[in-house]
């Protein structure tokens, strides 16, 4: 089975996302960047959209003793990790773009408060 992958193409950059099936982040259906926010959960709400656990093949690999998952469950787990990778990458890009803008806005506010802005 080939592994899923994704490519982000933006105006100034391209980024490849690839699955490493040995990495634990690609071995779960519970993503780090998906689901209800901590704020919502603290308010007592339950995550009704929580994904189901991956389905295991009925027989365990007797040589290794390691659980084997169905092909569809493997794909679900890999896509969950891939989605986390993409979400984290895009969040980092957004925050990187926001920083200079926020710094500039902060400077303008400080200038106004200090009275150094010409009227």
Swiss-Prot record:
Keyword Transcription: yes
Source taxon at top rank: Eukaryota
Disulphide bridges, residue numbers: none
Biological process, per Gene Ontology: tRNA processing
Biased composition range(s): Acidic residues: 108-119
Biased composition (Polar residues): 25-36
Example of a GO cellular component annotation carried by this entry: chromosome, telomeric region
InterPro entries assigned: EKC/KEOPS_Gon7 (IPR014849)
Cellular localisation: Nucleus; Chromosome, Telomere
Residue span of region Disordered: 1-62, 97-119
Keywords of the record: Activator, Chromosome, Nucleus, Telomere, Transcription, Transcription regulation, tRNA processing
Skewed-composition ranges (Basic and acidic residues): 44-58
Main location: nucleus
Subunit organization: Component of the EKC/KEOPS complex composed of at least BUD32, CGI121, GON7, KAE1 and PCC1; the whole complex dimerizes.
Protein family per UniProt: Belongs to the GON7 family.
Chain's role: Component of the EKC/KEOPS complex that is required for the formation of a threonylcarbamoyl group on adenosine at position 37 (t(6)A37) in tRNAs that read codons beginning with adenine. The complex is probably involved in the transfer of the threonylcarbamoyl moiety of threonylcarbamoyl-AMP (TC-AMP) to the N6 group of A37. GON7 likely plays a supporting role to the catalytic subunit KAE1 in the complex. The EKC/KEOPS complex also promotes both telomere uncapping and telomere elongation. The complex is required for efficient recruitment of transcriptional coactivators.
Name of the featured protein: EKC/KEOPS complex subunit GON7
Species of the source: Kluyveromyces lactis (strain ATCC 8585 / CBS 2359 / DSM 70799 / NBRC 1267 / NRRL Y-1140 / WM37)
Lineage: Eukaryota, Fungi, Dikarya, Ascomycota, Saccharomycotina
């Amino acid at each position: 089975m080939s592994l899923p992958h994704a490519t982000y193409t933006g105006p100034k950059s391209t980024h490849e996302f690839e699955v490493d099936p040995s990495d634990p982040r690609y071995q779960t259906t519970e993503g780090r960047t998906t689901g209800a926010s901590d704020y919502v959960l603290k308010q007592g709400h339950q995550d009704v959209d929580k994904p189901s656990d991956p389905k295991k093949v009925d027989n365990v690999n007797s040589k290794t003793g390691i659980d084997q998952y169905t092909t569809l469950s493997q794909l679900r787990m890999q896509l969950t990790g891939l989605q986390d990778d993409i979400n984290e990458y895009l969040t980092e890009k957004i925050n990187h773009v926001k920083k200079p803008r926020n710094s500039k806005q902060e400077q303008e506010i400080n200038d106004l408060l200090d009275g150094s802005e010409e009227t």
